[in-house]
Amino acid sequence: MDQRVKKKATIYDLSVLSGSSPSTVSAVLNGTWRKRRIKESTAETILGLAERHQYTTNLQARGLRRSRSGLVGLMLPVHDNRYFSSMAQTFEGHVRSRGQCPVVVSASRDPEEERRTAETLISYSIDQLFIVGATDPDGVHEVCEPAGLKHINIDLPGAKAHSVISDNYEGARMLTEAIIRHFGNDAPLRPDELFLFGGRNDHASRERIAAFHATKKALLGADPEDGVQSSGYSPDITLRAFETFYQRHGKLPRALFINSSINME
């Protein structure tokens, strides 16, 4: 006679068996699947699997927020950056000091990966999720909200959840002014000698670029159209942008505003 105790299913198990995301499984099990417009056939499949595999709500994904796992998540865009790695270290220290366990992951600035990562974290019943620099923070919110997961955006804001961000405009204004004043009166900087490299069409970059333009006009009296090279955050693409600039102008910029430390690295 087999004395082994059969392991009961978790939300993650049901996700694998049904081919549905953990958040979809959670919605079916907590009865909110109709609000999320999940097909009835999908709900029936998941409920059937839950019964067959002895799913019980007091196990892993009481991600329906009735129990606490002690896990706190931090989703970063990348790991290999001083800003984000420093944030991760500080985060881990604060979480551990509260007797909880930090879970740090990256989603590689990929909106689909951000949502998949959030779904996976939900399947492990994390208690909170800090979303840092997400490409699509509202997409992540749409995964977290139905599961009842507390979450907040850091660095880049979303429209559907609370956000904590830096004053990118004022920071860029101060930096642009400092660059200009560094040259003094003996060999003052001309408008066509100061360039901004890096960044893309996100909130932080838009604020920095707006301040860069405004400060150049205010202090230098002009702002040529080609003063901003939005080369994204990739160091390789930024390097190619520098090479293209050099080929076109025969020299490097006299003064340079780097939009992100990722570009500089």
Show the residue positions of the predicted features.
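Alpha-helical structural signal in soluble globular domains
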Residues: L49, T90-H94, V143, E207-L219
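Hydrophobic alpha-helical segments within soluble ligand-binding/sensing domains
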Residues: H162-F195, R206, P235-E243, M264
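N-terminal helix-turn-helix DNA-binding module of bacterial transcription factors
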Residues: M1-S67
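Hydrophobic alpha-helical
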Residues: L129, A134-D138, S205-E265
